[in-house]
Amino acid sequence: MLALQHASKSFGPVRALSDVSLELYSGEAHALLGENGAGKSTLVKILSGVHRADGGELWVDGQLRVFHSPAEARDAGIAIIYQEPTLFPDLTVAENVLMGRQPLRRGRIDRRAMLTHVGRILQELGVPLDPARPVRGLSIADQQLVEIAKALSFQARVLIMDEPTAALTGQETERLFRVVRTLRARGAAVLLITHRLEEAFAECQRFTIMRDGRWVSSGPAAAYTIDSVVRGMVGRDVRELYPKLPVTPGEVALEVRGLSRRGVFRDVSFVVRRGEIVGLAGLVGAGRSEVARSIFGIDPRDAGEVRVQGRTIPAGNTQAAMRAGIGLVPEDRRQQGLVMDLSIERNATLTVLNRLRRGWLMDRTAETQTASDWTSRLRLKAHRLTDPVSTLSGGNQQKVVLAKWLATGPAVLIVDEPTRGVDVGAKAEVHRTLAELAAGGLAVVMISSDLPEVLGMADRILVMREGALVGELSRQDASEEAVMYLATGQQPAIGSVA
């Protein structure tokens, strides 16, 4: 259906693509895999008409094509669904889907025909959305489905999806992929760009791997393993993804006893010792993030006690939690962990600004030194610390969030989905950082929906189900099957809760 052959693209002296080829077939989902900077975005922009290749050929349905604009690519049946939907929030679903192409009757928009047409598209996709509803207020997941309906209204047969599940829950992700399977069954070709390798293996029939702007390999998904994909993407073995260092746990740093919040979680008890990484696993909605937020004092609790190094922390008091030595790296770093318009330097010191003041004035030298110290330790890749934090990659943004909390000198660090939305190479760096911090005596609580991450990094794994802590697994006894049995209730709890 689509073939890109030996494509190259440069921007000034920078070679973004060099001799890259890609083939998409009707009825197949094809994963495009590579680290940030591998050239995936440039390739997609060539396919979608944003950029023209300097060399190579693009064939669509057996015809040689040269796109001068996104409109030409769209007319050829190629559509792209971005991670952040680009819809008009104050218009309805139907108006967004048919923007600029609304059916007319006697010179005026025929709203009944518009709603009927869009309703039919949504029904074909199995999407229960009201076409008359305004887009404002829809979840990101629903907005992406509106974008897919819009693509189908253009008779798109090639759908490019750029990190579509990065901001979705597990249930939303499954619903999205049900729609993708429907599209494939109708003969569409889907190009999926994702950092989530488990999604690629579950949903895609073919893979293409890129590294440093070059094609590495292509082939059937069945011919690859996680190890071979990672090696192709980063040139390193998969074992380097989880560089866990051996530690001997020390004294208890965090003690949680009988933590409860009505309707959310109940009677949660566990301890974490210095030097340990304790994983908190479970299905979406099990209450893991809510427990973390309650420990840190963001959310209230009805009962229970939190102690840090023997000191009781009052409920609902984040300042007390910070003073006691707790740090929390939140699940959504862009919305909750960073101020995107501020500099890297200021974001890295937000938690310690009071220490960096001289009277009423900020000691800029001390601020710069503090930010520089921690970002250097975390091997941050940035041009200047005065640049906006929004200019960084996802992995480097996560390092800034870590720097912000490490600057407080915590005894306990809670990290919620620490590698969500970052590429494989950045994952390895975040994992190495957590392992080094634990080896230095920090107590780490790691909440993650990425089971290989939990299994690879945790000394112990606590599993939650429906707001309750249902079991504990040692590193030696843990497996994906054992965790999922506990998380789903398919088997009696294994192990004991501390």
Curated annotation (Swiss-Prot):
Keywords: ATP-binding, Cell membrane, Membrane, Nucleotide-binding, Plasmid, Repeat, Sugar transport, Translocase, Transport
EC number: 7.5.2.7
Chain sites annotated for binding ATP: G34, E35, N36, G37, A38, G39, K40, S41
Any one GO CC term of the record: plasma membrane
Location in the cell: Cell membrane
PROSITE patterns named among the record's database cross-references: ABC_TRANSPORTER_1, ABC_TRANSPORTER_2, RBSA
One matching Pfam family: ABC_tran
Predominant place of localization: membrane
Source superkingdom: Bacteria
Any one GO molecular-function label of the UniProt entry: ABC-type D-ribose transporter activity
Reactions the enzyme catalyzes: D-ribose(out) + ATP + H2O = D-ribose(in) + ADP + phosphate + H(+)
Family: Belongs to the ABC transporter superfamily. Ribose importer (TC 3.A.1.2.1) family.
Function recorded in the entry: Part of the ABC transporter complex RbsABC involved in ribose import. Responsible for energy coupling to the transport system.
Name of this protein: Ribose import ATP-binding protein RbsA
Source species of the chain: Deinococcus geothermalis (strain DSM 11300 / CIP 105573 / AG-3a)
Organism lineage string: Bacteria, Thermotogati, Deinococcota, Deinococci, Deinococcales
